[in-house]
């Protein structure tokens, strides 16, 4: 017999550690190459080539950008609140990455006779024969999204710059406006699945139609509101270059600036992963390929959609942004909840 800890073999713990590392590396590589993919996709949509110089067809461009930012000078404004200025990028970046702890990437795998779910915050219960995960996974993700905006607001305030402060204030107002609508949009999913567990929501979609077909309005509203919440075009008012130089990032340079950049793209990947889990059946797909492949394919399709939207739509004015959130999306989500409640009760 091999060495055991708490009645479980070392292979089990090694597999758990490897699972965390694989998810982290996957997210990190996706974030890095999402920047490259966006530049190439938008370039081709505008009849350009995009990055071409660094590596074959510019494939090494993310590495070149990372090296450049790493060696750039770290500048801190003389009148900035230095502690808050330095901690703000971390507050924005960390929640963007740890949200993946509750997202199921696929079915269980077997290691040393033990089944291990492809989800960080989950384990396989041999007594019930089911995967046990965080039963409020969706609330966990919504809470992390709320924490992330504190980093942006803190960056705007601590920089002691008018442009940065306006960007931070815009971000907080935008997050409040659209997180409310996004949260209400997915209540209809909870009503259908009768659970906040992401494993249960995915399992329910395996036995019938995806919730994107059962709840098309909720799917569209949640995806659009989530794009607005992470400040992606056409909702990128907090860092509007034509108005605020670079918004809350104006005074940042070097790796601190890169951390905000990574947080934006990590949030985009998180939003696409959550949308896949809630509305597109998670990892379920034709059985000739493993579940994790279908999950990644769906996530990448939604990431491409985000980039397509950026290349297609111009930026909203701020009054249009607020009007859309409060006078259009919020009433539509409430109407959808009422209609879903009536249908479920019949």
UniProtKB/Swiss-Prot annotation:
Q: Where does it primarily localize?
A: membrane
Sorted alphabetically, the keyword list is: Cell inner membrane, Cell membrane, Membrane, NAD, Quinone, Translocase, Transmembrane, Transmembrane helix, Ubiquinone
Cite a single GO MF annotation. Answer: quinone binding
Q: Does the keyword Lipoprotein apply?
A: no
- Report how it sits in the membrane: Multi-pass membrane protein
Q: Does the keyword NAD apply?
A: yes
Listed under GO cellular component are: plasma membrane
What is this enzyme's EC? 7.1.1.-
Transmembrane residues, as ranges?
A: 14-34, 83-103, 136-156, 172-192, 208-228, 260-280, 289-309, 324-344
Q: Which branch of life, at top level?
A: Bacteria
Listed under GO biological process in this entry are:
aerobic respiration
Location within or outside the cell: Cell inner membrane
Q: How would you summarize the oligomeric state and partners of this protein?
A: NDH-1 is composed of 14 different subunits. Subunits NuoA, H, J, K, L, M, N constitute the membrane sector of the complex.
Query: Briefly, what is this protein's role?
Result: NDH-1 shuttles electrons from NADH, via FMN and iron-sulfur (Fe-S) centers, to quinones in the respiratory chain. The immediate electron acceptor for the enzyme in this species is believed to be ubiquinone. Couples the redox reaction to proton translocation (for every two electrons transferred, four hydrogen ions are translocated across the cytoplasmic membrane), and thus conserves the redox energy in a proton gradient. This subunit may bind ubiquinone.
| Similarity comment text for this entry | Belongs to the complex I subunit 1 family.
| Protein name (record) | NADH-quinone oxidoreductase subunit H 2
Name the species this protein comes from: Geobacter metallireducens (strain ATCC 53774 / DSM 7210 / GS-15)
Source gene? nuoH2
């Amino acid at each position: 017999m091999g060495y055991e800890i708490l009645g479980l073999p070392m292979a089990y713990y090694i597999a758990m550690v490897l699972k965390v590392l694989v998810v982290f590396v996957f997210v990190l590589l996706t974030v890095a190459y999402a920047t490259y993919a966006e530049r190439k996709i938008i370039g081709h949509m505008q009849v350009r080539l995009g990055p071409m110089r660094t590596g074959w067809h510019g494939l090494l461009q993310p590495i070149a950008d990372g090296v450049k930012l790493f060696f750039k000078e770290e500048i801190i404004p003389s009148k900035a609140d230095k502690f808050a200025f330095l901690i703000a990028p971390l507050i924005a970046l960390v929640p963007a990455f740890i949200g993946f702890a509750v997202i199921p990437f696929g079915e269980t795998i077997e290691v040393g006779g033990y089944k291990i779910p492809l989800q960080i915050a989950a384990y396989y219960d041999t007594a019930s024969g089911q995967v046990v995960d965080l039963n409020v996974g969706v609330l966990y993700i919504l809470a992390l999204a709320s924490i992330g905006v504190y980093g942006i607001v803190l960056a705007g305030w601590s920089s002691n710059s008018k442009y940065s402060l306006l960007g931070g204030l815009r971000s907080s107002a935008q997050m409040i406006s659209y997180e409310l609508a996004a949260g209400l949009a997915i209540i209809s999913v909870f009503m259908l699945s009768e659970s906040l567990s992401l494993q249960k929501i995915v399992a329910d979609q395996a036995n019938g139609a995806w919730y994107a077909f059962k709840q098309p309005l909720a799917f569209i509203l949640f995806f659009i509101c989530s794009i607005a919440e992470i400040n992606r075009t056409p909702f990128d008012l907090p860092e509007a270059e034509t108005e605020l130089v670079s918004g809350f990032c104006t005074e940042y340079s070097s790796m601190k600036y890169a951390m905000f950049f990574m947080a934006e793209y990590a949030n985009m990947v998180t939003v696409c992963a959550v949308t896949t889990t809630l509305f597109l059946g998670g990892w379920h797909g034709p059985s000739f390929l493993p579940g994790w492949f279908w999950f990644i394919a769906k996530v990448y399709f939604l990431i491409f959609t985000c980039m397509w939207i950026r290349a297609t739509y111009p930026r909203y004015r701020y009054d249009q942004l607020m009007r859309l959130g409060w006078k259009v999306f919020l009433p539509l989500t409430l109407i959808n909840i009422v209609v879903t409640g009536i249908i479920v009760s019949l």
